[in-house]
Amino acid sequence: MTSLSKKALFVLVLLVVGCSTTRVDEEINSAFTISSDESIVLLSNSYHTGNQTELDFMECVNSSISKKQNAFDILPTRQFQNLFYPWFEPSTAPQTVEDLPKVLGNDLIKEKLSQMKIKYLIKITGQTKTNASSGALSCAAGPGGGGCFGFAWWDDTSEYTASIWDLSQETAVGNVTANVTGTSMIPAIVIPIPILARTQSNACEGLSNQIVSFFSS
């Protein structure tokens, strides 16, 4: 293969890989309202119930929602957990909306939530996982230099759901979801160049957009 052909093939690889597909959905169960002086809080599912939603994903959604709107406040997850310790730690927090009365039955907790005007708790579940992978890279060094050759790829799926709970009504008012699939690849002709689908960051963007849109509807 000529040098020009190799370059053409490499450009083609850059164009066709590292892509992702995003699907978002929204479900509204009952009427809801929120004002500018009220807050929402995001919590992840517990590691006791399976795979815990990644910490960096939770931080991404918290930050993204804060930047996208000024219609309501968002209390950072870790700050909320510290203020209400130990009631909303991963091992003790309610895992379903049916568990809310167990926590809100504590008058001290309920009064503090009311004083801080925390109206909605958003329970985020999901994870990013690799579905399939293949290929191989080989790197070597010699007297004339070194390099890597080969081709590797993997498919990732990032699927997350946010269940929105009204703390005053102790009920779920809706759900939003983001599902992102993508293929990442690393072609190597002397120098390996990762081309990443970044499904988790795209899922963060999609889910935060859906949450903001939910409260804007």
What label would you give each PLM region?
Residues 72, 77-78, 131-133, 171-183:
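Short, solvent-exposed beta-strand-terminating loops
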Residues 46, 78, 125-128, 164, ...:
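A mature extracytoplasmic/lumenal domain signature
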Residues 19-101, 114, 213-217:
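A structural "domain/chain start" motif
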